């Protein structure tokens, strides 16, 4: 469910049309995107936009209640993983609701992206910098 204004029309539309428990994926430049899933490709050059900047933009717009990440993310890219966790914890404070964190293998994560309404590709080149957000409600 949508919260605020977002400049990217395609991304704004996807967020505005999410129902409760619908999912979107924000991914690094290398994650394979299923053919049947809508691709919103924001990547310009390596590192632009960053994973974190994209997450911030989406969190400013989308109410989330659940998060799925690959187990490998925390192990291989701990700094970026911690930055994401900090943003999620801040989101919990802002919305006053608990956000569920789940971890799966990277292979299971890739399969799970097939259930996403859209996959948002960033220019991030940090390994395993991928997250699935499950839509919550603002009420």
Curated annotation (Swiss-Prot):
Against HAMAP family, the record matches this protein to: D_rib_pyranase
| Isomerase listed as a keyword | yes
Task: List cellular component terms (GO).
Answer: cytosol
Point out the gene that encodes the protein.
rbsD
Subcellular location per UniProt equals: Cytoplasm
- Which residues hold substrate? 28, 106, 128-130
In terms of SUPFAM superfamilies, this protein maps to: RbsD-like (SSF102546)
Q: What sections of the protein cross the membrane? A: none
Recorded family membership: Belongs to the RbsD / FucU family. RbsD subfamily.
Q: Which Gene3D superfamilies does the record match to this protein?
A: RbsD-like domain (3.40.1650.10)
Any idea what this protein is called? D-ribose pyranase
Q: What does this protein do?
A: Catalyzes the interconversion of beta-pyran and beta-furan forms of D-ribose.
Quaternary context: Homodecamer.
- EC nos: 5.4.99.62
Entry-linked PANTHER family:
D-RIBOSE PYRANASE
Give the GO biological process terms: D-ribose catabolic process
Taxonomic lineage: Bacteria, Pseudomonadati, Pseudomonadota, Gammaproteobacteria, Vibrionales
Q: Which reaction does it catalyse?
A: beta-D-ribopyranose = beta-D-ribofuranose
